[in-house]
């Protein structure tokens, strides 16, 4: 079973590392090509393109300028420990054991606008480049055209390496659009998390992101191999709803959260 998740905008390069083990990202030739384009952007260009504040634009212009083709423990850290959004709160990688990290390295992949596809222990220099960014580049008008079939081919290689053909899509629509499902050698399953709010069940972004991380961790902790085992996911009050689920989309619901 292979899990795919989105990256996070929030990064952490300060907390103590839960492991010293690391690998190097595999698509850095592509990243370097993108970085040439990014380095031509002024802070004003970045603010407009990414729809961010002047402060964040300045920070990311500096990150682009400082980015190096050589990755070391001085200028980078493992991707799974560098990302710090809602998904990664649910995943809680800082509590993993060395055995967990080894398992995760084989069974989890992170999509990325700059790095394409990251393994958990791949060193990552800080950046912000969301997959939906309309960044014109030598391969097209946006990052989907830039990455083309590269990410899908990498996912197929990872699927073959880890031993079965089940791909669990815990990424956002923005990021999963970088994957070509028809070219995947996989049974693709997309879990959907619905929370009750005022009597209605709907996807609430904050809760759904955290739930994606919790499901990834559930798969890792329990070394889950089968689709039926995945349906047993019951963390934080979620439960599988067979009547609303299909072969490709698993619906999980949760009752209203009391604050």
From Swiss-Prot:
InterPro entries: YaaA (IPR005583). It holds the Pfam family H2O2_YaaD. GO terms for biological process: response to hydroperoxide. It comes from the Bacteria. GO terms for cellular component: cytosol. HAMAP family: UPF0246 (MF_00652). Belongs to the UPF0246 family. PANTHER family: PEROXIDE STRESS RESISTANCE PROTEIN YAAA, PEROXIDE STRESS RESPONSE PROTEIN YAAA. This is UPF0246 protein PBPRA0561. The lineage of its organism: Bacteria, Pseudomonadati, Pseudomonadota, Gammaproteobacteria, Vibrionales.
């Amino acid at each position: 079973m292979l899990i795919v998740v989105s990256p996070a905008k929030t990064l952490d390069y300060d907390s103590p590392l839960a492991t010293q083990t690391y690998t190097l990202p595999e698509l850095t030739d592509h990243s370097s090509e993108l970085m040439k384009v990014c380095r031509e952007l002024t802070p004003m260009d970045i603010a407009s393109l990414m729809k961010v504040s002047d402060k964040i634009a300045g920070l990311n212009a500096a990150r682009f300028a400082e980015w190096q083709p050589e990755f070391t423990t001085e200028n980078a850290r493992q991707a799974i420990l560098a990302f710090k959004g809602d998904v990664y709160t649910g995943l809680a990688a800082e509590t993993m054991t060395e055995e967990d990290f080894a398992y995760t390295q084989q069974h989890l992949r992170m999509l990325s606008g700059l790095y394409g596809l990251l393994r958990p222990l791949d060193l990552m220099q800080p950046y912000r480049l969301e997959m939906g960014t309309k960044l014109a580049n030598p391969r097209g008008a946006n990052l989907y055209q830039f990455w083309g079939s590269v990410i899908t081919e990498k996912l197929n290689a990872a699927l073959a390496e880890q031993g079965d053909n089940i791909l669990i899509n815990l990424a956002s629509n923005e990021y999963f659009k970088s994957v070509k499902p028809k070219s995947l050698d996989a049974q693709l399953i997309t879990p959907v998390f619905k929370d009750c709010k005022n009597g209605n069940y709907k996807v609430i972004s904050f809760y759904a992101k955290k739930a994606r991380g919790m499901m990834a961790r559930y798969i890792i902790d329990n070394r889950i191999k089968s689709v039926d085992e995945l349906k047993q996911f019951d963390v934080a009050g979620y439960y599988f709803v067979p009547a609303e689920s299909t072969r490709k989309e698993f619906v999980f619901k949760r009752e209203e959260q009391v604050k």
